[in-house]
Amino acid sequence: MGFFSTILGFCGFGVGISLGLVIGYVLFVYLLPNDVKDPEIRSIADQDPKAMLRMLPEIPLWVKNPDFDRVDWINRFLEYMWPYLDKAICKTAKNIAKPIIEEQIPKYKIDSVEFETLTLGSLPPTFQGMKVYLTDEKELIMEPCLKWAANPNILVAIKAFGLKATVQVVDLQVFAQPRITLKPLVPSFPCFANIYVSLMEKPHVDFGLKLGGADLMSIPGLYRFVQEQIKDQVANMYLWPKTLVVPILDPAKAFRRPVGIVHVKVVRAVGLRKKDLMGGADPFVKIKLSEDKIPSKKTTVKHKNLNPEWNEEFKFSVRDPQTQVLEFSVYDWEQVGNPEKMGMNVLALKEMVPDEHKAFTLELRKTLDGGEDGQPPDKYRGKLEVELLYKPFTEEEMPKGFEETQAVQKAPEGTPAAGGMLVVIVHSAEDVEGKHHTNPYVRIYFKGEERKTKHVKKNRDPRWNEEFTFMLEEPPVREKLHVEVLSTSSRIGLLHPKETLGYVDIPVVDVVNNKRMNQKFHLIDSKNGKIQIELEWRTAS
């Protein structure tokens, strides 16, 4: 009897402990305390110092930190738009999650995973402040302080082995301070190509998780474990300097950089038509690359010759070989007046094979459609023989990012042996002012070539964002780029039609060594004037 009583005692003890744990868990989860009171609301002026210290972490950043701006207008916008944003975000989340779930569930022998209910609730996130950084690069950097105490209802049904279980997420709280970078800024809507998101500190994430109606987060120890795991996992993926990159625009279309160089050799023309009374002509060829701001390039004039030979070579930077075309126009030079067009034709770059010489014989026409005003093609105008070579840039020379490379004054070690292309981007100027007028434009001199930007009328802080290229046979390790800001009067008859607003000479050796430089230069002969110039050096081999 003593043995059986001992066994029964142990069984009773086990049953009692089990029932006690179950009853205690149910009471802990489902019974609400009765001593809950609404918080007392008082003005800040009535708070004592200890209460103020307790409330200090909850004060918005725009109050504590002068670098942060108040953005109540964004909060009002979110409050008004949240019912519509909620539906749109949930619909997008379902569409993104569906193929991922379908791919993963066979690995775990799960029949299905479905969203029975998905809503983010009626409370939108709020921004406690926002800090904006200004840089010389084509980017916009923002650091908002985000707080979101939401009442979502996310109910997921999981079916496996003939059983169904529901998991519900409620009472979500997220406090985070992300850094959002929009770059590069481009002239195509929405005006930026990528979104870079980083977290400046570990986020605070809190939520309720129910399984079959029971709150799993109420289990002692589980809440803290889950919260720390979420913080660590999110920090490992997105804590600065790690970033989440969201592409918005196709890089090739958003930021059209030169991708190669086309070498053009004008060999000869055959059978040109007579243009003067003596039965001859003074032909020359004008070459233009479509969608390029660089002026047309010209051959020399061959006097009194209907079958001229030039054998002259030219180079053009290519941005889109699939759409750009070379336009060849033959003109008859006139000593007085404008030259007369003798014929023209075009050649699409997409017909070129990279790194392969190819000869073309182009039949000259009056216009691209062969005639004018709907008339049939005119008489024979001769032929033009040209040779082309398209050399795309190597992968090493293509731009990999938009981070600034600082220029360093040092000897040109490792200078490339072959020639290349110098890209000059004139961004903007600041505090330029003339004595008689301020209609600024920029004139660039480099190795005997000249480039000009457009004129900006009556502006002390003009923006151009214009790009120019210089084809060079060898690296410019000893040359300087002369940049001059000028102003011309918009009126006729003034005593001072043109004046200099400042200039700067930029050594190009640093660009050859470092591939890229983007900075502001103080203008000489200007009181406070500055100009922002971006330089790049690219080789074709």
From Swiss-Prot:
**What sequence ranges are listed for the domain C2?**
240-362, 401-521
Positions in the Cytoplasmic compartment:
33-541
What changes when the gene is disrupted? Reduced growth.
Keywords assigned = Calcium, Cell membrane, Endocytosis, Endosome, Host-virus interaction, Lipid transport, Lipid-binding, Membrane, Metal-binding, Repeat, Transmembrane, Transmembrane helix, Transport
Annotated region Phospholipid binding: the residues are 227-509
Q: Which cofactor does it need?
A: Ca(2+)
Name the domain of life this protein comes from: Eukaryota
| GO biological-process terms attached to the record | endocytosis; lipid transport
Q: Where in the cell is it found?
A: Cell membrane; Endosome membrane
Tissue-level expression: Expressed in roots, shoots, rosette and cauline leaves, inflorescences, and siliques. In roots, expressed in vascular bundle, epidermis, the differential zone of the tips of root hairs, and the quiescent center and columella of root tips.
Q: Which InterPro entries match?
A: C2_dom, C2_domain_sf, SMP_LBD, Synaptotagmin_plant, Synaptotagmin_SMP
Q: Does the keyword Transmembrane helix apply?
A: yes
Does the record bear Transport in its keywords?
yes
Pfam families attached to this UniProt entry: C2, SMP_LBD
Family in the record: Belongs to the synaptotagmin family.
Q: State the oligomer form and interacting partners.
A: Interacts with cabbage leaf curl virus (CaLCuV) BC1 protein and tobacco mosaic virus (TMV) MP protein. Interacts with ROSY1.
| Annotated function | Plays an important role in maintaining plasma membrane integrity during freezing and osmotic stresses. May function in membrane resealing during calcium-dependent freezing tolerance. May regulate endocytosis and endosome recycling at the plasma membrane and cell-to-cell trafficking of cabbage leaf curl virus (CaLCuV) and tobacco mosaic virus (TMV) movement proteins via plasmodesmata.
Official protein name in the record: Synaptotagmin-1
Organism of provenance:
Arabidopsis thaliana
Q: Which gene encodes it?
A: SYT1
